[in-house]
Amino acid sequence: MALRGGHAAAAAGVSSGSEDDDEEAGFSRSYFLAKEKEPSSGKKRARAAGKLSDLNLVDEQVLRASLAEIPPKHEREVEALTRSYKEQYRNWLFELRCGFGLLMYGFGSKKMLLEDFASTTLSDFTVIVVNGYLPSINLKQVIVTIAEIFWEQTKLKRKRQTATRSQLQPFASQSIDDIISFLNNQTSDNGDDNVCLLIHNIDGPALRDAESQQYLAQVSCCPQVHVVASVDHVNAPLLWDKKMVHTQFKWSWYHVPTFAPYKVEGVFYPLILASGGHAQTMKTALVVLQSLTPNAQSVFRVLAEYQLAHEKEEGMHFSSLYTKCRERFLVSSQVTLNSHLTEFKDHDLVKIRKHSDGQDCLHIPLVSDALEKLLQELT
């Protein structure tokens, strides 16, 4: 019996070994078959050379309408979260009165939350709302508005009922530094004289430059001005240095994820998978041009200026462009100009049209307004 068992074990071992060999051989065959079916390196390069502009993108309005039809989820949980934030309103008000600025961050739109806080809790403040998510903001006008509010309050205190609106006009003609100096001199023990600057997205595209942030920081230092703001960009803290954070804004950070959709804020941002029209095309063109050499940018500017000056023409002849670029010492030969034009055409910055005389002419596929704005941004 033992002998039979030994033979059985040996047979099992042989069988197991042969199965392993077969499996390994099968794996090897599968590997080489897969390699044979892989596309060649040339095909890989061709596929990698595909551009986003080659895709058939859905119209932006259709895409936004579809997004609006998506039903909200976890409504009860979101409502409970919002209620927990509302319970902190008194603490927020206390910190605001103590001279701190409130900075709200976290996933989701905080627009409704902040406006609810302002309408229910800041009744003793004059609230000025700044929509930082807008593409452009007149920051000086915001500061002028604050100054006019204090001027009105001063006028009421002194009972100067005869004062006319024209007395407020000098603020608009003054520099921002002068207006901030005026604000710094406004002091009062009356809580009703406080102004709250409510900034939705202080990290918005129109407020991201250093100058705007410096002015906002200086305004936040004014005795009667308080700041409540929200941020959404992951790199928002990089907008401020240590002095701005701790001695000017004096931020008190609050993590308040609302998970609310960015319905209002998102209107001003183009959707990646949508054909966003002239505004998005202009932004894309600007990004591409900024990555090119100054000489290439100057060549593009020559073509753009010609197109703006001759809107009714079909385009600019290559010979005319070459002559103008030679006059400005931008190119030394047609080969150099051709290399620039090839780069423009690869990025869809320039199209070639057939002129009525049969010659090829160059055309930038942007409407005049977008082209003018592009040239302004490029300087």
Swiss-Prot record:
Keywords, in A-Z order: DNA replication, Nucleus
Biased composition (Low complexity): 8-17
The keyword Transport is assigned to this record: no
Tissues showing expression: Mostly expressed in roots, seedling and inflorescence meristem, and, to a lower extent, in mature leaves and shoot. Higher levels in inflorescence meristem than in shoot apical meristem (SAM).
Keyword Transmembrane helix: no
Domain of life, source organism: Eukaryota
GO biological process: DNA replication
Cellular localization per UniProt: Nucleus
Function according to Swiss-Prot or TrEMBL: Essential protein. Component of the origin recognition complex (ORC) that binds origins of replication. DNA-binding is ATP-dependent, however specific DNA sequences that define origins of replication have not been identified so far. ORC is required to assemble the pre-replication complex necessary to initiate DNA replication.
Protein name: Origin of replication complex subunit 2
Organism: Oryza sativa subsp. japonica (Rice)
Name of encoding gene: ORC2
